[in-house]
Regions:
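C-terminal "cap" of GNAT-fold acetyltransferases
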Residues: 80, 115-129, 133-165
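Acetyl-CoA-dependent GNAT
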Residues: 4-10, 15-93, 99-112, 139-145, ...
Length: 165
């Protein structure tokens, strides 16, 4: 089941956020930064985020618990929507929940009038890049350098045309 996130989801969103980062980004970003991530600190961030959402945060559930989330909204580029984040708890990788969550995010962007969408992904994250490509996203031209956990990393942009409601 996919639904909009609610304030009561903050702790589960924090758990998914931390465990997915610590697993997916192992070897890709600063390990000390990953090791220092705590669910407690992320709960505070999610409490704040959910009270000031700049778009929509969708969650997917499995066995009555939040299994993943997708955050979407307007991009800085004119008319573009953006998938700000999509993460699944590692125990739910590879079973189709991510595909459904991404499709729901794309649909939400289309319903909000965005004709195309973008997302950013670490250039070294082969698993995520393959996932996006399987979902019809194509590599765009821009790259950017971001500082995550005290280390500079390269991100590439993926793009996809959207259909409306």
């Amino acid at each position: 089941m996919i639904r909009d996130a609610e304030p009561r989801d903050a702790a589960e969103l924090a758990r998914v956020h931390v465990t997915s980062w610590q697993t997916a980004y192992r070897g890709l970003i600063n390990q000390a930064f990953l090791d220092a991530m705590t669910i407690e600190s992320r709960i505070e961030r999610w409490d704040t985020l959910l009270s000031h959402v700049r778009g929509r945060v969708l969650v997917t559930e499995a066995d009555g618990k939040v299994a993943g989330f997708c955050s979407v909204g307007p991009a800085d580029a004119d008319g573009w929507g953006e998938v700000y984040a999509i993460y699944l708890a590692p125990e739910h990788w590879g079973v189709g929940l991510g595909r459904g969550l991404l499709e729901a995010g794309e649909k939400a962007l289309g319903e909000n009038g965005h004709g195309r969408a973008q997302l950013w992904v670490l250039s070294t994250n082969a698993r995520a890049r393959a996932f996006y490509q399987r979902q019809g996203w194509t590599l765009g031209r821009p790259i950017r350098i971001e500082n995550i956990g005290g280390s500079d990393v390269t991100e590439v942009r993926y793009e996809k045309p959207l259909t409306g409601p």
